[in-house]
Regions:
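Thiamine diphosphate
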Residues: 1-120, 125-126, 131-132
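Flexible, low-complexity linker and terminal segments
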Residues: 2-4, 141, 146-260
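Short, well-ordered, mixed-charge alpha-helical segments that flank or form enzyme active sites
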Residues: 18-19, 101-102, 137, 165-168
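Active-site-proximal alpha-helical scaffold in enzymes
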Residues: 56-59, 63-66, 139-151
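Active-site/ligand-binding-proximal alpha/beta "capping" segment
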Residues: 125-147
Length: 260
């Protein structure tokens, strides 16, 4: 995650996800390469609801952000996942699977949560679910997850499992130079009448960040117009739903076929 430009991660301790965050805490400042310093802030929150809320809030400031959890914690994140979806906020949720349901077998391996990740949250909104098969895939897939979150302005759920989380393996040396960073339509300046949710042919609007001059925007959990103001107008509702769903076409085009 540090190599991929992640600058904020929140978590609430849960097996088997905690190992990742604890490792990141130990290496919050790590020289990745000559032009890329790690410097990632890790925050342990009071619960999983706070964890995803802080990750989404960090993303609003323009930094790459993530949170990490397992099945029971992801259940608690579902509502804020939808909030990120309707507000088109990029965030990466790393879901380390274990055996369920409920507490299940908290220290045992499981791969039960694919459909849950695909369908979590009420209503319809686009998201990307990436499932990695081994440690090496996990490294490079993480870069894809952050890029796709930024490019399409959607939540990305990266599915791993206890085996990947807890294993010590011998593999090829990771190559940070193969990790590219694409921030998508993140603005560095905004002029005139800025519309955070402006209609566009690909469904992806220019994205401001908190504190950007002339880039004021509004976020609520309600349907909104192009500026972000609450709207219950049925025509606007259809337009906004269509706008968000347009991203699916773009995702299917850009995500490599071998990954689908």
């Amino acid at each position: 995650k540090m190599v991929c430009g992640c600058r904020f991660q929140s978590y609430y301790p849960i097996t088997p996800a905690s190992d990742e965050s604890e490792f990141l805490e130990t290496h919050e400042i790590l020289q990745i390469k000559e032009d890329r310093l790690g410097s990632t802030t890790i925050v342990q929150t009071e619960d999983e609801i706070s964890a995803i809320g802080m990750a989404v809030g960090a993303s609003l400031t323009g930094v790459r952000s993530a949170t990490s959890t397992s099945g029971p914690g992801f259940s608690l994140m579902a509502e804020t996942l939808g909030w990120a979806g309707i507000n088109e906020i990029p965030v990466v949720i790393t879901l380390f699977q274990r055996s369920g349901p409920s507490t299940g077998l908290p220290t045992r391996h499981g791969q039960d949560d694919l459909l849950f990740a695909i369908n979590a949250g009420h209503g319809e909104f686009p998201r990307i679910v990436y499932a990695s098969g081994d440690v090496e895939d996990s490294f490079y897939d993480t870069g894809k997850c952050f890029n796709f979150a930024d490019i399409f302005q959607v939540p990305v759920i990266h599915i791993l499992d206890k085996f990947i989380a807890s294993s010590v393996v011998t593999c090829k040396r990771f190559e940070p130079d193969l990790i590219s960073i694409d921030r998508g339509k993140l603005l560095e300046k905004a002029d005139g009448d800025y519309k955070r949710f402006a209609h566009s042919p690909d469904g992806i609007s220019p994205r401001s960040k908190l504190g950007l001059e002339n880039g004021v925007f509004w976020n609520t959990g309600d349907e909104s117009d192009e500026h972000g103001h609450i709207s219950e107008d049925p025509v606007n509702r259809i337009q906004m739903m269509d706008k968000r769903q347009k991203k699916v076409e773009q995702i299917l085009t850009l995500v490599p076929k071998n990954d689908q």
